[in-house]
From Swiss-Prot:
Keywords: Cell membrane, Decarboxylase, Lipid biosynthesis, Lipid metabolism, Lyase, Membrane, Phospholipid biosynthesis, Phospholipid metabolism, Pyruvate, Zymogen. GO terms for cellular component: plasma membrane. Its main location: membrane. Its EC number is 4.1.1.65. The lineage of its organism: Bacteria, Pseudomonadati, Pseudomonadota, Betaproteobacteria, Burkholderiales. This is Phosphatidylserine decarboxylase proenzyme. GO terms for molecular function: phosphatidylserine decarboxylase activity.
Length: 214
């Protein structure tokens, strides 16, 4: 499947344009000696908003990682968005990770719900319940419920979600973006088998988080 998005996220285009204009102006006025920090800033901004295509595993019961980052939680927890006990797997994204979110499974969206909140460090547990967040609840064709929650962080204060209830999602499909690092919680049915461990580095779409019970 071709990735239907530019490798530099559209969300970053205005920032890249501003950084490029500033670097060009400083270079024109003072030469490279004055402008090199701004060229370096431009390189950082471009790198920050990269959004590369990733291979998608073919395994039908696989739950794919929704974001790049590091695993900070694998535990049984209450899923308040689907009102159930669930296996919760949390991915923390730092400022150097890719910041787009991609669907963990194929399915139909049953609910999208936004919650205002605080902006605590997204790596800590209480960020899941106290920070600003946006939950997407997905029903698979086999009747399984998978909840993916975008969570704002200490620096990240803008959650973007591009899907609505009733729409279909394909695994690996890009559905959201959070600027400047944050967290994504995934809630899965009890009986799902986690395939990652705390501290592990993971990649959106290409890392298998868990396997749904068949």
């Amino acid at each position: 499947m071709n990735y239907p998005h530019p490798i530099i996220a559209r969300e970053g285009w205005p920032f890249i344009a501003i950084a490029a204009v500033i670097a060009l102006l400083i270079h024109a006025i003072g030469g490279f000696g004055f402008a090199w920090p701004f060229w370096l800033l431009l390189v950082f901004v471009v790198q920050f908003f990269r959004d590369p295509q990733r291979p998608i595993p073919a395994q039908p019961n696989a739950v794919l990682c929704p974001a790049d980052g590091r695993i900070v939680a694998v535990e049984t927890s209450h899923d308040p968005y689907a009102n159930r006990e669930a296996l919760k797997i949390s991915v923390f994204m730092n400022v150097f990770n890719v910041h787009s979110q991609r669907s963990p499974v194929d399915g139909a969206i049953s609910k999208v719900e936004y919650f205002p909140g605080a902006f605590l460090n997204a790596a800590i547990d209480k960020a899941s319940t106290e920070n600003e967040r946006n939950a997407v609840v997905i029903q698979t064709a086999s009747g399984k419920t998978v909840t993916a929650v975008q969570i704002a962080g200490l620096i990240a204060r803008r959650i973007l979600c591009y899907v609505r209830a009733g729409e279909p999602l394909s695994r690996g499909q890009r559905y959201g973006f959070i600027r400047f690092g944050s967290r994504v919680d995934v809630y899965l049915p009890l009986g799902s088998r986690a395939k990652v461990s705390i501290g592990e580095k993971v990649y959106a779409s290409s890392t298998i988080l868990a396997e749904l019970e068949q």
